[in-house]
Every structure is written in structure tokens, then in C-alpha cells.
């Protein structure tokens, strides 16, 4: 075990971890060398990785083998390019898988274009020119998306950053001014401002894999 106090900092590849206290735990290998297994950070946690930044953490744990971060705090914020992800409870980040998850009062914002809220939000990330950007946003439970001219509600939502279309599933309600539409599935085009209630499509395999990943890590 290694402990550092006061403006502590740990660096691993492109990843940087800062906090008031850092504890590193080692595993002894067959050739008697020591490999870092877990890193724990306490108070004023700041995590940076290729222009992506997480702040507001009171406690963070990094599993080196899984390349997985778990951060706790009441005012967590992840910033990547023009996008912001917030949580009042927990944030998780799988570096190698390109997935970030906010649980508890989750909120995703893209400048002044829209705000998505849900009990749990998932960011699918990808790297372009050594910068991490948001490819897709998935919301679970009590989902709402607010744009400049409309508010939409559903049980689940999937936003594609490339097409700028948000797909809403289950108990959908679209509200614009005093008028509203209801249904089980809708597509909200945030670029054109056009929203449609449509027949529900079949469940996509990518969303199933993301949910399985989240549930597996949550149980461990």
C-alpha cells in the first residue's frame, strides 16, 4: 500500500487523478514485482483523460485491470467538449469501453441545445483527434429532454449525436406549449425541431450490451 497526502496526483497513460489523499494498492506478481491493482482517492477528486474532466468527487476508486472508475459525490460533473454530464450520487467510467454512467439525479447538457434528465444516464464515447466526444446518450427511468421549443418525457431515451435524433420509448409524452401528444414511441429531431409519434421498433443489440455492462458492474 502506498499513501500520499496533500495535492496528491497519480498518472496512468493519458489518465490523471488528483485529490487530497491517494492510496495505491499493489499485487505481488510471480517474479516478485509489484503491480498496482487499485487506486483510491479521497476528497476534492479531479480526473482528467484526453480533454475529458470529472470534478466534484468526494471518493473515487480506480480498478487498473478493468480500466474502470467509480466516483461518488453530491455535485459530480463530467465535461467533454461541448457536453456536460452531472450526477448527485455516483459516476462511473469505463475507459477502454468508452462508457460513462451517471446515477442519481442524472443530467446531460449540450450547450444551449438541450438538457436530458433521468435516474440514470449513459454516455457512449469515442475518440477523435485525441479528444473524447459523446457519440450517444442513453437514459433509463423518468427520462425527460428539454429543447428550445419542446419538452418530451418517456421511460427510456436514446440520443444519437451524429443524427441529432432522440428516440423515446414507453409512456411517451411530447409537450409543446399547451398542446401534447402521447404514445409508446417517438422520435425527436433536435436539429429540425420536428417530433413524431411512431410504431415502436425492435430493441437494438447495442443498448442491450450497454445495460448488461452497467448491471454487471453495479452488482460487483
What are these regions (language model features)?
Residues 1-220:
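Mature-chain termini and adjacent capping regions
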Amino acid at each position: 500500500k502506498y499513501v500520499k497526502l496533500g495535492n496528491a496526483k497519480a498518472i496512468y497513460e493519458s489518465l490523471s487523478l488528483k485529490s487530497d489523499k491517494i492510496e495505491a494498492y499493489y499485487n505481488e506478481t510471480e517474479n516478485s514485482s509489484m503491480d498496482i491493482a487499485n487506486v483510491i482517492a479521497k476528497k476534492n477528486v479531479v480526473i482528467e483523460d484526453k480533454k475529458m474532466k470529472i470534478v466534484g468527487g468526494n471518493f473515487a476508486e480506480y480498478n487498473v485491470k478493468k480500466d474502470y472508475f467509480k466516483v461518488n459525490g453530491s455535485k459530480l460533473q463530467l465535461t467533454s467538449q461541448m457536453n456536460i454530464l452531472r450526477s448527485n450520487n455516483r459516476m462511473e467510467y469505463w475507459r477502454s469501453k468508452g462508457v460513462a454512467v451517471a446515477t442519481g439525479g442524472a443530467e446531460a447538457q449540450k450547450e444551449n441545445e438541450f438538457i436530458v434528465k433521468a435516474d440514470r444516464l449513459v454516455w457512449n464515447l469515442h475518440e477523435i483527434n485525441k479528444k473524447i466526444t459523446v457519440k450517444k446518450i442513453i437514459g433509463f427511468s423518468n427520462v425527460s429532454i428539454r429543447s428550445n421549443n419542446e419538452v418530451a418525457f418517456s421511460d427510456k431515451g436514446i440520443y444519437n449525436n451524429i443524427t441529432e435524433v432522440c428516440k423515446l420509448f414507453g409512456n411517451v409524452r411530447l409537450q409543446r406549449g399547451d398542446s401534447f401528444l402521447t404514445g409508446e414511441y417517438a422520435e425527436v429531431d433536435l436539429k429540425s425541431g420536428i417530433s413524431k409519434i411512431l410504431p415502436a421498433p425492435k430493441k437494438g443489440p447495442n443498448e442491450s450490451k450497454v445495460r448488461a455492462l452497467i448491471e454487471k458492474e453495479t452488482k460487483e
